[in-house]
């Protein structure tokens, strides 16, 4: 029977004041067309892969992101814009978790099975991801906008 091995575990809490600058330096440029929640997801995911000494997420690995609230500030922005009748496309796109997954895929040089889950139960999210996962493993993160990001890179032995 296979067992799980953690290659890296990264927790950023509290967030450093310059985390966006650190991300831009790591990527070689500022991420474009991403909201703060997606940027925070990318920041944590990139730190985790760096800690695992992986330049890109392995082909066949699964990507999972979970949160209690998702991109809350973007949702608030579009709610305010909807009241005026002028919802801006960029703000709307930032409120969509699928756009965060697309940005992670692009910046991690990866294609594959990616999912976002709203949940209060980290253990249940992890167990489900592990049950669905193959030999290439899993990159799983918990992202709370303007608060913290926590990521694990795990593989089967």
Residue ranges and their predicted role:
Residues 1-157:
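Conserved "HGTGT" condensation-loop signature of ketosynthase/thiolase-family condensing enzymes
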